[in-house]
Amino acid sequence: MPSARGKSKSKAPITFGDLAIYFSQEEWEWLSPIQKDLYEDVMLENYRNLVSLGLSFRRPNVITLLEKGKAPWMVEPVRRRRAPDSGSKCETKKLPPNQCNKSGQSICQKLVSAQQKAPTRKSGCNKNSVLVKPKKGHSGKKPLKCNDCGKTFSRSFSLKLHQNIHTGEKPFECSNCRKAFRQISSILLHQRIHSGKKSHECNKCGESFNQRTTLILHMRIHDGKEILDCGKALSQCQSFNIHQKIHVVGNVCQCRKCGKAFNQMSSLLLHKKIHNGKKTHKYNKCGRGFKKKSVFVVHKRIHAGEKIPENAKALSQSLQQRSHHLENPFKCRKCGKLFNRISPLMLHQRIHTSEKPYKCDKCDKFFRRLSTLILHLRIHNGEKLYRCNKCEKVCNRHSSLIQHQKVHTKKKKLFECKECGKMFSGTANLKIHQNIHSEEKPFKCNKCSKVFGRQSFLIEHQRIHTGEKPYQCEECGKAFSHRISLTRHKRIHTEDRPYECDQCGKAFSQSAHLAQHERIHTGEKPYTCKTCGKAFSQRTSLILHERSHTGEKPYECNECGKAFSSGSDLIRHQRSHSSEKPYECSKCGKAYSRSSSLIRHQNTHSEEKA
């Protein structure tokens, strides 16, 4: 039956040739090492899949070449052997040298006979040999020219691939994260991040990798091979350095300007860009720097009071978001913080997950960062590397030394921002800070209509309304909406209070708190109420007082709806719902929800003694 025959033809089995992709020498040289690795992975995987299906066909030459580590466009020299079986319609023969006098390679030529043109599937060519045709490149003719840079190509494929560099076209988009790529090989490699596929496994320790090159570098750890110095071959010894520093405390890459330590030279080089001022376009009025001249120009227009046209609103918004969306595309889903690279984001996320993968073998303490573990191990080794030139105190961290030295420099005058009360050690820092209050504020809170100059400030502010507190203290479990609040809180546990009052000796963890405390001795009250003229030593006290005139009560209880003028009053009130009594008498164990109630109770014990 004719219809049956036609049906059988349409169900012909798939062959390796249907899935294979072949490159000429010129096209192969265009590929990067990562793309070549990807090509090898895909071809070998396709071959294994077909074999696993039980399909019978000859081993393709391209697979043999790839397994031997040779370039897939090369063809092995033809051995003297018997002609292939009658089922194959392919022959491999060496062309006479005069047919290609500039190429010294053997060329596999497929000879198609009249019988091969028959419509039946069986008479097709089953031999998957890699064809390398005599190239136009030998004659020196490259008819295809790039109009942008004048570079010539012998194939339209190569020209199109090259032109994407000039046009910036990235036609291949990842469906998971919308990241775009110029070449399909790049997107295939990228998608392994989402799929978690790691096809290259170490046969010694079982660790898997996305790329073959990474596996080869990893194998050097087991082989114990000498790795070149970081400065000479950083890209080749990076994996070894990471692994080595888990076991060896030494050779820490340290920034000479700020003392920050890194476990990789590449991380240090990236960090140094902060100090070397890579933002070449700096505006003198506010001190801000910009990488792009176009953004710098728009920023100057805002200072000049020039109105940005309606059609340039998007550009103005991108200016405000430059440090977040343009330069920091990676966002934390928990707290909204933005990062310029995925690796700092992954490190940051450990704050929320409490993941601490690095363990100290001596005291079983765990750490989020390898660099922190390395610094911690110095405590066990008795190392104290940083000495104060004022009092000879030694610290094992440069950051601790800087913090300590503030004790000696505390007498320097602090400059306060009249808008928010924040303190600064110099007028230059205060001036830069004051731009926050004067600049355009396009980000508005939909709850209270407060406006902000940066999206990150808005995200932090909105936590007041949502009650979200993503930063938790590991010591006592107390949670905070801002990371800086957690950092300050941790000083309670470490008892690190470098700021001491000259009058009474009381110490503080923050310079701003010391400045506020010193007003008790001086009697200074710089904050005056415009309504009644009452003066206060702290701005927060003035804000709370002003609410008595306005009747504003922004803090509302979720349980009963009662509102309060201060957050502390709300916290005290909420204890009536939770029955929480954190203030306990050390003598009789009786507990209270308010500290004032505890003080009154403790007076009864003192009266009994009397």
Swiss-Prot record:
Q: Does the keyword Transcription regulation apply?
A: yes
UniProt keyword annotations, A-Z: DNA-binding, Metal-binding, Nucleus, Repeat, Transcription, Transcription regulation, Zinc, Zinc-finger
SUPFAM superfamilies per record = beta-beta-alpha zinc fingers, KRAB domain (Kruppel-associated box)
GO molecular function (one):
zinc ion binding
Q: Region Disordered: start and end of each range?
A: 119-139
Q: Which InterPro entries match?
A: KRAB (IPR001909), KRAB_dom_sf (IPR036051), Znf_C2H2_sf (IPR036236), Znf_C2H2_type (IPR013087)
C2H2-type zinc finger locations on the chain: 144-166, 172-194, 200-222, 253-275, 281-303, 330-352, 358-380, 386-408, 415-437, 443-465, 471-493, 499-521, 527-549, 555-577, 583-605
Q: Which GO terms describe its biological process?
A: regulation of transcription by RNA polymerase II
Q: What GO cellular component entries does it have?
A: nucleus
Classification via Pfam families: KRAB, zf-C2H2
Cite the CDD domains for this sequence: KRAB_A-box
Domain KRAB as annotated: residue spans: 14-85
Query: Bias regions of kind Polar residues — which residues?
Result: 119-129
Where located?
A: Nucleus
**What is the predominant subcellular site recorded for this chain?**
nucleus
Q: What role does it play?
A: May be involved in transcriptional regulation.
Matches recorded under PANTHER family: ZINC FINGER PROTEIN, ZINC FINGER PROTEIN-RELATED
Record family assignment: Belongs to the krueppel C2H2-type zinc-finger protein family.
Q: What is the name attached to this protein's record? A: Zinc finger protein 667
Q: What is the lineage of its organism?
A: Eukaryota, Metazoa, Chordata, Craniata, Vertebrata
